Regions:
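Alpha-helical cap/lid subdomain in secreted, periplasmic
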Residues: 2-149, 153, 159-167
Length: 167
């Protein structure tokens, strides 16, 4: 709320939000966390700011978290990311699935992608996260073209509503 209040007098062209990991580790209720994100995105978009959200990363990649807790946090991370996607898209923002794009790198080379505390990303991990959202951020600002218009849907394939596609 404090950061958002500072932006009200001079809304930025673009806001990039990385969110979710602390909500999982602090056991914040998903409805509360997503509701807060929804309000922030709504306010920013309403002020003319393009919003790109890097959704909750896969905390199942954090190796100091033992099994079976690692499986539980992986599932909670993915469920929160799906709910974040629905809320952000409904409010006019864009999302980037950090879990889908980065989890395999963090799992394959944890010593490279995690910092000394083995929880937070290293400089390389943060650089990969920034690179993951960059195309969407550039497109939101009109610096890159939007993805080409898709051909008409194949009637033999079902299109899913955003809530099902995000899951």
């Amino acid at each position: 709320p404090t950061q958002l209040a500072k932006l009200r007098s001079h809304p930025p062209d673009l806001a990039v939000i990385f969110i979710g990991a602390n909500d999982i580790i602090r056991r914040r209720r998903p409805a509360e966390a997503v509701g807060h994100l929804r309000e922030v995105v709504r306010e920013l978009v309403g002020a003319g700011t393009a919003v790109v959200v890097g959704t909750c990363p896969d905390l199942g990649t954090v190796q100091p978290i033992g099994r079976p807790l690692r499986t539980i946090v992986r599932r909670a991370s993915r469920q929160l990311a799906a709910a974040q996607t629905i809320a952000v898209v409904e409010e006019g923002g864009r999302t980037v699935s950090l879990s889908d794009l980065l989890a395999s790198d963090f799992l394959a080379q944890p010593e490279e992608f995690f910092g000394p505390d083995r929880f937070h990303p290293s400089a390389k991990g943060y650089a990969y996260a920034a690179a993951a959202v960059l195309p969407s951020a550039c497109a939101a600002l009109g610096l890159l073209p939007e993805p080409a218009e898709q051909p008409a849907a194949d009637p033999s394939q079902d299109l899913l509503p955003v809530d099902q596609a995000a899951a």
